[in-house]
Amino acid sequence: MLKTIATKIFGSRNDRVLRKLNKVVKKINGLEPAFSALTDDELKAKTAEFRARLEKGESLESLMPEAFATVREASRRVLGMRHFDVQLIGGMVLTNRNIAEMRTGEGKTLTATLPCYLNALTGKGVHVVTVNDYLANRDAETNRPLFEFLGMTVGVNIPGLPPEVKRAAYQADITYATNSELGFDYLRDNLAHSKEERFQRQLHYALVDEVDSILIDEARTPLIISGPAEDSSELYIAIDKLIPLLVKQDKEDTEEYQGDGDFTLDLKTKQAHLTERGQEKCENWLIENGFMTENESLYSPAKIGLVHHIYAALRAHTLFERDVDYIVKDGEIVIVDEHTGRTMAGRRWSDGLHQAIEAKEHVKIQGENQTVASITYQNYFRLYEKLAGMTGTADTEAFEFQQIYGLETIVIPTNRPMIRDDRTDVMFESEAYKFQAIIEDIKECVARSQPVLVGTASIEKSELLSNELDKAGIPHNVLNAKFHAQEAEIIANAGYPGAVTIATNMAGRGTDIVLGGNWRAEAAKLENPTEEQLEALKAAWQERHDVVMKAGGLHIIGTERHESRRIDNQLRGRSGRQGDPGSSRFYLSLDDSLMRIYLNEGKLNMMRKAFSTPGEAMESKLLAKVIASAQAKVEAHNFDGRKNLLQFDDVANDQRHAIYAQRNDLLDHEDISETIKAIREDVYNEVIDQYIPPQSLEEQWNIAELEKRLKQDFALDLPIQQWLEEDNQLHEDNLRERIIASAVEEYQHKEEIVGAETMRNFEKGVMLQTLDELWKEHLAAMDQLRKGIHLRGYAQKDPKQEYKKESFQMFTEMLDALKLTVIRTLSRVQVRTQEEAQAEAAQQAAAESKDYADDSASGERSVAQTTQRIGRNDPCPCGSGKKYKHCHGNRAAHEA
């Protein structure tokens, strides 16, 4: 109450920010006459002037009015578009690490040029982040003439580029890229074996387009680079035959209720659970089919992997639907993004789920993968020094943006008043009645030449509605994951008089639907169009535009409410752009997913009783409250899930930072001998401590085992017992010094044979490869720890604290293992002179009567490893960083 009164008196926080920014807008407008009078060369020279002023200590904030005035004038001359005042406000909001909510059609692409130019003046690079390749290319090509006029370079980074092209894109002042490619390049950079292989420079400023889609909808999707793991495709095929034998049970077993089913489903979390009866049935089937013996249990340590396969197959059959969650295309399972309706080629579900779905659909099962590197979008984008975003729908998620990313959401006013008619939701008892009403609404719109955009929640529903429209004889276009290639053309035609377009969720997002159609898209199809042709296209468009305006603009039909209000608002936002007329209405039924999953049986029964006659439509304030309540529950549940994920991932993120910082330090230094020296001393001291405890008596020493360990692990054959017998003055400290000195002497001897440069390369290669291998194993161990950590709650322990504690212990153990493995590998490598290598080669040739060409016949000294000492998977001693089997080991085998 008091807050409402205060807001009325003083205005909201948003109002106060806008009032402050309007003062700067007046200042920019005041500069316009002077900047309009500048010649092109004088306007271009402003970029060099601004950079010089920055170097002298001026801030970006003080340069902002002049920089924005420069961009506005350049845009007017080059693109023929002048920034509106509200776009200047949007640009200022984006400069100040905020999120700008700008309605559809308000010109976000043009607005982005302002903060991009300003932040690119620093020379540190700007990343404009889009959700797909099409938008990255489109926006870059649209704004390239403007930026190049002002002396800025523009790059585009999308999947599949050659390394040199990708590297050049990152060196540009302004780089347009997809969110996934930026994240993957970051991971690739941290798997590189030389600094020349890296792509990204310092992460300075990111402007995220459709920020809600990337930072919220995809927040729980980790980016993973993986390598092959053990193949178990036959097991997936076998287990797939078990699932149809299992029977669903509606409720979990309790003391009061004992069901007769084999499994239960949790539709909210998309999880399946076996009942006791189900476990017994699975065990019996596994025994009958030879996967287990009668003495074994499904949960015995040796068979626990079978549980993983059963649950993956169970989820594949019961919770993931074809043409809803995925499609089958060219013999592969392709995931469909639940938020956008777009396919996500190249992405795979983890934990064996993707393989289980491949078995279910009888397509080729691709091997499981082991994670080599991973990061979430939440943690990747928090690496940027400055982060900003823009979207048409952010205000409903403002709290989450503030909590997770520290970004304030500012709602930018529209250039013209929004006059769209958002009508009350209509509820029907069943989906069949709902579709009948939708068809009637579409018929009425088509009759008066009003274009219609129908939003559906899945491919399945879009095709079902398409069939109904075919029966009714209504021409229409379908835009879903199956017709992704035709997206731009379908959207370009969606504003034609009487056009009917069915789209899954927000397929086509990022492209405006122009009333009357897009004449520019038509012009683009013509080869070298004449002025007369262009004028004819414009005239035809104007005629169609007037017809659509008179009919009421674009009409939006939602076929069901989404889990999030934001997605519903995105659908509505396709209509009423830049003051155009428009309308929207959602048609709902009690069969909709939101109703079935998130409303209890009592509320559903109460609503069913409200329908007195078949096919009756219901509109009421109570209905709106029930739907809002269900959506609020889902949004809160999803926010908690993302926040919980971040809290766990932050633990791994701290470790990731430490490892990647260490790795980059290695790449940036040619000589790491001092690091190796320090590690060697630590490792030998720790090993010696195990057999000669500090401040212990000589009787407590285990010299025989120490000699054995040094020889076995470090190829160091030292007569320590003999030293002690010959020298009574030897005590713990000077004995320790003598052992380490012997190790150093042995290592220096190897270095003298092969040369310092070769040894430095070898040290670096061993260090990098060992670090990568142990980090990969650590990620797998962390993943297993995380999957089971929730069980600690049953022991009255906080799972998050337990996870932090145990993961830190595992990380410490990994670092210790890194030191030991590096020193062990460097110590065990055997080197020999060129003459020795040639002599051995000659002996082998004589013994086997085969020609053998020595790889190092150039006369230079080289590193070689004996087969007893270096395994095929050990680092190659040449210093390449590759495994021996992929480097000189492979070459030697080929030549032999």
Swiss-Prot record:
It comes from the Bacteria. Residues 882-896 have a biased composition (Basic residues). Transmembrane segments: none annotated. Keywords: ATP-binding, Cell inner membrane, Cell membrane, Cytoplasm, Membrane, Metal-binding, Nucleotide-binding, Protein transport, Translocase, Translocation, Transport, Zinc. Zn(2+) binds at residues 876, 878, 887-888. May bind 1 zinc ion per subunit. Monomer and homodimer. Part of the essential Sec protein translocation apparatus which comprises SecA, SecYEG and auxiliary proteins SecDF-YajC and YidC. This is Protein translocase subunit SecA. It comes from Mannheimia succiniciproducens (strain KCTC 0769BP / MBEL55E). The gene is secA.
